[in-house]
């Protein structure tokens, strides 16, 4: 299996070199062709997904996991739409970030270039297969994809559609390759392919991400766990707070930007907590803590990915910041308040990739941010942080123009 992974990486390197200098118009045309192909092959994709779902149900898979795995016509249309959105976005490659002329006449320019060969390890969600391809391709990168065994048939069907679209445009099919999900060693070989793979992005649960970070020999961009908070400040409009809380928790509880903890300001807890807890329970959410007292520490640390939420009381905005910085995962936090000074203090003090002021945590998403799609939501601080779009899939290089200058001794 090691040889198979390395051979795939070498083919990806060849494709990446072609993509790095490919004109924007060619990339955009190919992405639109891929979108059309995905839509045209909806029936085949749904049939493959049905097999994955049937196998998952036979093993008593959790409802949240089934939701992430499932495709329907609407989700396939969204996948194709994401490719069209990426095609419509500006090409980051060649963008000049800064440039200036030195006293000796040398002209310096720093510009964006592709990362190269990007490995992607992900669980469950087959839409990531196409999202990763779209962002990698537009930014001039070749993608090595390793999805989960639970979505193997769905991922294979999607990659076959992408390959056919690329070949129809006389472009290298090796720009996107699907590694075997049947052998767990493919993950190890991918994350240890130093010199063949430029970066690996794991997207999944804490166990997957921790294992990849621990064992990797190539650079990793963590797309972290989402223990997201909604803090209802003492100056909150409670109708707005209730609306934001329910959307953050119940819109799609199985995704990483769903709220997992509600923090209520002590100054308003007596009359606010019963209302918000009742709203949550009325929507089918199981409340941990709240009216029965503060939740256990384990509940405060948990990414439920289900219709569960921890509820706790904090003594003001500084206590909310301290709580989030201790228990949060650096993903997305929201404050609901009409006090803009408190909102700014919260935004400045919380150490997370995204801070929402009077808005749902569900907006932390590449599509919502105008990226067309996202490769993941990075919770680390180096290279990229927050939703990763096209720009985050690039590096930079310096180009220096001269007319014969030499450096003095």
From Swiss-Prot:
Pathway recorded for this protein: Amino-acid biosynthesis; L-proline biosynthesis; L-glutamate 5-semialdehyde from L-glutamate: step 2/2
Which Pfam family name is an example for this entry?
Answer: Aldedh
Which GO BP terms apply? L-proline biosynthetic process
Give a yes or no for keyword Acyltransferase in this entry: no
Q: Where is the protein found, in the record's own terms?
A: Cytoplasm
For the keyword Amino-acid biosynthesis, the answer is yes
Listed InterPro entries: Ald_DH/histidinol_DH, Ald_DH_C, Ald_DH_N, Aldehyde_DH_dom, G-glutamylP_reductase_CS, Glu-5-SA_DH, GPR_dom
Main localization, broad class:
cytoplasm
One cellular-component annotation, GO: cytoplasm
Which protein family is it in?
Belongs to the gamma-glutamyl phosphate reductase family.
Give the protein name, as stated in the record.
Gamma-glutamyl phosphate reductase
Look up and give the organism this protein is from. Answer: Mycobacterium leprae (strain TN)
Q: Which gene encodes it?
A: proA
């Amino acid at each position: 299996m090691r040889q198979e992974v390395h051979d795939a990486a070498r083919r990806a390197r060849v494709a990446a070199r072609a993509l790095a200098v490919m004109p924007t118009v060619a990339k955009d045309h190919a992405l639109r062709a891929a979108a059309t192909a995905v839509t045209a092959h909806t029936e085949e994709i749904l049939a493959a997904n049905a097999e994955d779902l049937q196998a998952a149900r036979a093993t008593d898979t959790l409802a949240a996991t089934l939701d992430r795995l499932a495709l329907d016509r609407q989700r396939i249309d969204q996948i194709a739409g994401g490719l069209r959105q990426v095609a419509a976005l500006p090409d980051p490659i060649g963008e000049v970030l800064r440039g200036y002329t030195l006293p000796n006449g040398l002209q310096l320019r720093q510009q964006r270039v592709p990362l190269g060969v990007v490995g992607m390890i992900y669980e469950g969600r087959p839409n990531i297969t196409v999202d990763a391809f779209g962002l990698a391709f537009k930014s001039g990168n070749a993608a090595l994809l390793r999805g989960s065994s639970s979505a193997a048939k769905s991922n294979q069907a999607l990659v076959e559609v992408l390959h056919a679209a690329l070949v129809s445009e006389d472009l290298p099919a090796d720009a996107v390759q699907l590694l075997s999900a049947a052998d767990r060693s493919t993950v190890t070989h991918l994350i240890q392919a130093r010199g063949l793979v430029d970066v690996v992005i794991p997207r999944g649960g804490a166990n997957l991400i921790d294992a990849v970070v621990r064992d990797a020999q190539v650079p990793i961009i963590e797309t972290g766990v989402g223990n997201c908070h909604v803090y209802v400040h003492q100056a909150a409009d409670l109708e707005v707070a209730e609306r934001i809380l329910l959307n953050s928790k119940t819109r799609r509880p199985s995704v990483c930007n769903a709220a997992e903890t509600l923090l209520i300001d002590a100054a308003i807890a007596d009359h606010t907590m019963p209302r918000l807890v009742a709203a949550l329970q009325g929507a089918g959410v199981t409340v941990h803590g709240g009216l029965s007292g503060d939740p256990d520490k384990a509940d405060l640390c948990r990414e439920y990915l289900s219709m569960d939420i921890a509820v706790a009381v904090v003594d003001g905005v500084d206590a909310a910041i301290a709580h989030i910085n201790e228990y949060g995962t650096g993903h997305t936090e929201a404050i609901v308040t009409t006090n803009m000074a408190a909102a700014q203090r919260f935004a400045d003090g919380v150490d997370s990739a995204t801070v929402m002021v009077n808005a749902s945590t569900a907006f932390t998403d590449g599509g919502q941010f105008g990226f067309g799609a996202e490769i993941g939501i990075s919770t680390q601080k180096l290279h990229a942080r927050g939703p990763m779009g096209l720009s985050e899939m690039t590096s930079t290089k310096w180009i220096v123009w001269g007319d014969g200058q030499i450096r003095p001794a």
